[in-house]
Amino acid sequence: MLSSIAKLSSMESFELYIFSFGFATFDICSLVARAVVIMEFLLGSFLVFNLLHRFTKWITAAFLAIFSIFLLWRLIKGDTESCHCMGDVVDMNPTQSLIKNAVLAIMLAVSWKTDRCVFLRQNLIAFHIAAVTMVTVFLICPPDFYYRNTSESNDLSQEAFRPVADSLDLSEGRRIICFYSATCEHCRHCASKMAGIIRRHDIPLDSVSVLFMQTHVAQDSVVTAFYTEHGDGLVLPYHDLHPFDFIPLTNGSMPLVTLFKDGTFVKEYDYLSLDEKELASFFND
């Protein structure tokens, strides 16, 4: 239960971690992340109240085995970074998470034959707990595609940006132009999300540019750290703009991801409305 709550409190990081493996679209990874949180909370709740004890313990054992195999695979790959088993609340690497799983497995084995339940109508109680858990998770943390379907970003000042694009040679061909600040938390998440999309769909790096609002005198070192820590090491071409030049372009909103074709504005996204399918098809049409 604690693990699920920790993941829910840092859902953005958890879904980006799943997306980083590139096995599915970000939307699917968002659903997988929430499914994991829901399952962990339900299994924890059922174990605490000893509901559906036989089924719950077998499923819990299967989950521990699957996650442990995954952690062993990450260790073999040389991964020493956080596996997000406890979200961002407790930073645990694969080795530490394996130890945690071993302790949980021992606790599960000790309690295996405990089958006494003080509740009648276990199935009904379990159903209500499951329903409330699912609704709560999606209410507290809706997937990004919910916002994509309910809002549209229109923050870029195209008139103000046109001379900037011309001066930076960004007015030819099909281009993705991102507007970030290296100190903005949502920009960091957006950079990780964009890195996953670019790699998954082989989007040409020379067709993607980033405009950073300058926040430091030594901006180059700040941007390098930004790409290393939050862009999965994917270094994109970038330019720095003084805040007095940057803010009028986006009306102070960031991050923004925009599409241009030969200098003509096509589409704009904020972090939540970012559409992986549209970004990929933009270069394939």
What are these regions (language model features)?
Residues 102-129:
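Cytosolic-side transmembrane helix boundary signature
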Residues 205-223, 232-243:
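Thiol-based oxidoreductase modules, predominantly thioredoxin-like and allied folds used
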Residues 1-9, 30-70:
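Functionalized membrane-embedded alpha-helices
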Residues 191-213:
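Conserved helix-turn-beta segment immediately C-terminal to the redox Cys motif
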Residues 248-285:
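Non-catalytic, surface beta->alpha helical segment in thiol-disulfide oxidoreductase systems
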Residues 119-146:
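Internal/C-terminal transmembrane anchor helices
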Residues 228-256:
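Short, internal strand/loop/helix patches
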Residues 168-188, 194-196:
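Short active-site neighborhood of thiol/selenol oxidoreductases, capturing the structured segment around
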